[in-house]
From Swiss-Prot:
The last Arg residue of the ACP-binding site is essential for the weak association between ACP/AcpP and FabH. Keywords: Acyltransferase, Cytoplasm, Fatty acid biosynthesis, Fatty acid metabolism, Lipid biosynthesis, Lipid metabolism, Multifunctional enzyme, Transferase. PANTHER family: 3-OXOACYL-[ACYL-CARRIER-PROTEIN] SYNTHASE 3, BETA-KETOACYL-[ACYL-CARRIER-PROTEIN] SYNTHASE III. Its EC number is 2.3.1.180. This is Beta-ketoacyl-[acyl-carrier-protein] synthase III. Pathway: Lipid metabolism; fatty acid biosynthesis. It is an enzyme of class 2 (transferase). Its main location: cytoplasm.
Amino acid sequence: MIRSVVRGFGAALPKRVMTNKEIESRVDTSDEWIVQRTGIRQRYIAGEGETSASLGEAAARAALERAGLTPDDVDLIIVATSTPDNTFPATAVNIQNRLGMRHGAAFDMQAVCSGFVYAVATADAYIRGGLSKRALVIGAETFSRLLDWTDRTTCVLFGDGAGAIVLEAQEAAGTKADRGVLTAQLRSDGAHRDKLYVDGGPSTTGTVGHLRMEGREVFKHAVGMITDVIEAAFEATGTTADDIDWLVPHQANRRIIDGSAKKLGIPLEKVVVTVDLHGNTSAASIPLALDAAASDGRIKKGDLVMLEAMGGGFTWGSVLLRW
């Protein structure tokens, strides 16, 4: 059978770092409060000329270089983003053009913070279905441009950045020992759409709008939803928490990350955490964390890696893959 195997990975961050101390000068908050409630110490903020497409392009080029490939070797680009450069065309098409590609297919996916998990699942389906041989899967966000910088409940949480992986079709035995994507579990429930949303859009207000969130409601549902899709992945593959080498969660909040790991029985030393450095970068958070952990040698070839995320909608999902 065909598996979608990770060939390369890469990341890109804006030049500017914004610390909690700087946010203290903007709104009524403190470094101590932010760290205690979220685990965030800093975040990167896009500056002039830095966009979701430019960051996504840089991450894509890094992933291709790591894989020893060129844009000519890729036939599919999927970009997970809630902050596109334009309403249309897709940011993926923009990145395709920046890479000099004149072939293949490119499109965006919008599942907010779950976007990268949804995009990996979609690329895997294309590869297993024979519609793609190599796919660039990118998470790219500039959430700082959706923030109300007078709202202390949200402006402290988010940052900008991009990460990417290259998935390649490879023959496999069809067992849980295979390298590549082993299963994907996706969920959504639109009844919660008003708990985390942006109060604008082309067909309603004609404006971009600002991010709005009921933080307590999100926190209340997060751990249960996350563990649901992880347990479903275990069931689908005949694996358990003991088999996991690394849990790479969406980097939203340190308390959610720790709570999910504890409920699943996964030791914290097996959890990749970058929320302290990046803040919540939405669809970019998982590929940024993958890049960090694979670059420093923590994630190694053959490791069993669980990706999980929950985002606005609500959407949530998991991907279990062998590196």
